[in-house]
Amino acid sequence: MKFVLLFGVLLVTLFSYSSAEMLDDFDQADEDELLSLIEKEEARKDCIPKHHECTSNKHGCCRGHLFKYKCQCTTVVTQSGEGTERCFCGTPPHHKAAELVVGFGKKIFG
């Protein structure tokens, strides 16, 4: 009887140790996931929203619903005849078409 009791205590101890190791692994995975989410959130805060100027940072546009906005540039001619480049973050026409098709597909198929 003492042997069974000793074996049971040993088994419970090993089980609690192994479950503690597994919980530590899960906690580490949760921390890694949280850090990556925080980094993505910081990157989002630094991005340039839609319709805002991106002349100085052409690769810093935010993400839209499906695609990242693209920096679209035009040349603006002033009354004095000088041409300056002005850029803004926007959705290119082919991305608009793809978003329209996806939205239409979601309405039809659910």
Swiss-Prot record:
Keywords: Disulfide bond, Knottin, Secreted, Signal, Toxin
PROSITE patterns named among the record's database cross-references: SPIDER_CSTX (PS60029)
Record's signal peptide: 1-20
InterPro entries in the cross-refs: Spider_toxin_CSTX_knottin, Spider_toxin_CSTX_Knottin_CS
Domain characteristics, as noted in the entry: The presence of a 'disulfide through disulfide knot' structurally defines this protein as a knottin.
UniProt name for this protein: U1-lycotoxin-Ls1ll
Record localization: Secreted
Maturation propeptide residues: 21-44
Ribonucleoprotein is among the record's keywords: no
Organism: Lycosa singoriensis (Wolf spider)
Disulfide bond sites: 47-62, 54-71, 61-89, 73-87
The keyword Secreted appears for this protein: yes
Family as reported in the entry's similarity comment: Belongs to the neurotoxin 19 (CSTX) family. 03 subfamily.
One Gene Ontology CC term in the entry: extracellular region
One Gene Ontology molecular-function label: toxin activity
Chief location bin: secreted
Tissues expressing this chain: Expressed by the venom gland.
